[in-house]
Amino acid sequence: MSNPFVQIVEPLDAKEPVKKFFNLSKLEDVRYARLPFSIRVLLEAAIRNCDEFLVKKQDVENILNWKVMQHKNVEVPFKPARVILQDFTGVPAVVDFAAMRDAVKKLGGDPEKINPICPADLVIDHSIQVDFNRRSDSLQKNQDLEFERNKERFEFLKWGSQAFKNMRIIPPGSGIIHQVNLEYLARVVMDQDGYYYPDSVVGTDSHTTMVDGLGVLGWGVGGIEAEAVMLGQPISMVLPEVVGYKLLGNPQPLVTSTDIVLTITKHLRQVGVVGKFVEFFGPGVAQLSIADRATIANMCPEYGATAAYFPVDDISIGYLVQTGRDKEKVLCTKKYLEAVGMLRDFKNSSQDPDFTQVVELDLHTVVPCCSGPKRPQDKVAVSDMKKDFETCLGAKQGFKGFQIAPDRHNSVIKFNFEGCDFELAHGSVVIAAITSCTNTSNPSVMLGAGLLAKKAVEAGLTVKPYIKTSLSPGSGVVTYYLRESGVMSYLSQLGFDVVGYGCMTCIGNSGPLPDSVVEAITQGDLVAVGVLSGNRNFEGRVHPNTRANYLASPPLVIAYAIAGTVRIDFEKEPLGISASGKKIFLKDIWPTRNEIQAVERQYVIPGMFKEVYQKIETVNEAWNALDAPSDKLYTWNPKSTYIKSPPFFDGLTLALQTPKTIEDAYVLLNFGDSVTTDHISPAGNIARNSPAARYLTSRGLTPREFNSYGSRRGNDAVMARGTFANIRLVNKFIDKQGPQTIHFPSGETLDVFDAAERYKQAGHPLIVLAGKEYGAGSSRDWAAKGPFLLGVKAVLAESYERIHRSNLVGMGVIPLQYLPGEDARTLGLTGRERYTIIIPENLKPQMNIQIKLDTGKTFHAIMRFDTDVELTYFHNGGILNYMIRKMAS
């Protein structure tokens, strides 16, 4: 059927009649001008894609009527303009695509129908680790090791880029996905197939929201959902509430964008924005650069919103020019946005739209801060850090407690490193990493760090040699301006050499600590510290030996590295003593905003962006030399320990199976609150005594060849064994942290995988019990695929993080939620019961269903299939099964 809104199509420029757009101002509907700008993007996509099948006229009306419909839990479809993937989530996506081609062929269909319809970019940034640091050749050494470890994965991805149309691979060594997206891939306005329309994106990484800072609406989705979008399916989403976040005033001189985002994160966690859009407005926005806005948007998952949108304004347009985008295209971008009423003037309050609610922040009230020691939302003012850490030491085990006995608070362990004697104590910094797209995309904080390093070196300050220091920029542009401005050599003198272009320490690829440091930490049971300019600091994520991890701005990372401890009051205690005996305080070396801006104006210029990005796809010689097969169907290598055909589609037929009641399920694990996807499916090192290690050893590998869980996401045998394998897992069945559980029929304590295998062999279904925020953190599809392979049929939790619930749905695992006011405690659940979950034939979205226990007790829970489309996926056994049946029939 033709588009019912064709009457509002017109050329953007009369001189170019072939280039058209849907002119939303021609709707002549007064509601349009009151819509939040983020909702206008959803509306335009619905109008442009309206076909009365996937997108209906009623969907358009529901979005236009947002002010009323936002409270009605109404489902709307959204077709984003692009998909982005990183390699940890991208490899399993390409594995699934290859396996789907095989499945379609087996069912008699055309395998080449499995092909991205929506354009996809895959940026390889998650594989590189900090094996080498504090040496001039660290970058080359780490990149060589990356290729040695990941050659097979990289060959597979190169095959994918050739076998599938519409899929572009950005090679390793190019930068971090979100920074590359911001500086290079993002268009703001698309010019495709004869139409102009707003750029929008979904990505298989939760920090995809970073590009919201440029005015490109985007957010993270599960890998499974992203695959469906690539195959032309719209995202089915509940029309969101939009919280207006009003920024007022100017930041104080010493405050960085990192301080602002950590303040906003804590504030919005308290407001409660899960499942909502946040849209920024107010005169304070005009004080923020695009890099500052992108930093704030990047940490959107940490405050729990779906998107954190900054509408496009003249500063956004200026950023496109600054980053070397084509000037003619930039002019068209501005002209289009003006025509459709999507160009914002933050100083003009008459443009302020309607919001669900409005909250405010005066930027002048923000003070320098960090977040930690275990969660991004736990903000601590720098002036309070010493006192806060010392309180955490003795506090009860929890997000703000380590339960260290008072008589051990001042324990000191002596150790030798490279022939010199040193001491470690609670609070000693052992990792200091300038890392992560959150901050390395921001010239003001990166140049601030460089200028602070210069002043520190000139004052005679140093960093202790055992501290693992590193600098992993999000793109080559950063190195370019640090070098050109003359600060790179000072960073190197403090140990902050460039170690790679990728996520690195921020995702746990921090590499090993020196043996003597690990021995000292272990001997003293010390709460050692990592300080990083990252976006997440969940327990066990950054490094197994840093129990406390603080998020901080790049200049503060260097300051704490010089101090060597977080038990310092920077206002009263010096960082060190100069050669002349003078006490040097942090305020003595902290650069002013004027100093930073002067350097930024001189050295961050369009030419450097053009130079770096024009050769991004061809500059990596090792990638160019990779040999990849050219077949359209992948030839699986049975000896491979990286790439394996997954069992998800084994035995799939065209006929649907009726979902059955889950009978007498055992509880595999019993969790409390805030179990993250890092707990469920860790990305870091494979422990030598783990089920995954035993499997890899049986395949002839040595521990040096294990690599990380993240790198092995193309192999289901490793990933199933790595499910719930986090060493910091807290399972209520077990009285200590670790990846174990009780196998109830035998009463034995086993590794989680081994227990699940025993249940499976006996034919027993499994469920998981959890508290609030189950599945928080990274958009990790293996956190749903892994439990599915272990035989988990359902999860019963108090609440879910959005992306993880969607991933469970995508795998056909039932997300159940306690009724309001109920939880495991109020219902008296111990997890030792057996659970029968009644699945009625007439399922409806968010239906209350009955659960019977073997004790005779009965209660109800909400089945969190939120839309009719999600129910369709469930009836098919998951979203990918649905797509295969659709393509094969």
Swiss-Prot record:
The keyword Iron applies. GO terms for cellular component: cytosol; mitochondrion. It comes from Gallus gallus. Pfam families: Aconitase, Aconitase_C. GO terms for biological process: citrate metabolic process; intracellular iron ion homeostasis; tricarboxylic acid cycle. It is found in: Cytoplasm, Cytosol. The lineage of its organism: Eukaryota, Metazoa, Chordata, Craniata, Vertebrata. It catalyses: citrate = D-threo-isocitrate. [4Fe-4S] cluster binds at residues 437, 503, 506. Binds 1 [4Fe-4S] cluster per subunit. Its EC number is 4.2.1.3. The keyword Transcription regulation does not apply. This is Cytoplasmic aconitate hydratase.
